[in-house]
């Protein structure tokens, strides 16, 4: 099943880009009200469900999915990584962006190895 996952820090255009794809879902809407530990689990359960999923928390869901599915494949999954913010960030947003990039660098090689197509945006 084809799925597009759009990842990146705050202000990078994830939501705007997602609106140009079929069935866009915003990660924050899916995890609202869930405890921190449950958020990654819930997002991991969305991997492979088709459509488009975007949000800053998606990298955590991908990391959790990789850990939970050690032999799982991601053919048909496109991951778009956006790293350049288009707006000035607050100090908190800058810290969040740094954390997201750290997780991204950790998981990107494994995503490729498992068959995901990765597209780097700006």
What are these regions (language model features)?
Residues 12, 16, 57-58:
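Short, well-structured alpha-helical interface segments that form or flank functional binding sites
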Residues 6:
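Hydrophobic anchor at the beta1->P-loop junction of P-loop NTPases
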């Amino acid at each position: 099943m084809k799925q597009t996952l759009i990842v990146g820090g705050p202000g990078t255009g994830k939501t705007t880009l997602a609106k140009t794809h079929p069935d866009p879902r915003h990660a924050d809407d899916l995890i609202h009200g869930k405890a921190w530990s449950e958020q990654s689990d819930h997002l991991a359960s969305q991997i492979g469900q088709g459509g488009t999923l975007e949000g800053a928390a998606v990298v955590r869901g991908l990391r959790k999915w990789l850990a939970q599915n050690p032999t799982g494949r991601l053919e048909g999954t496109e991951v778009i990584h956006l790293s350049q913010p288009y707006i000035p960030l607050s100090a908190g947003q800058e810290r969040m962006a740094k954390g997201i990039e750290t997780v991204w660098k950790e998981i990107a090689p494994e995503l490729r190895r498992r068959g995901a197509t990765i597209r780097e945006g700006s």
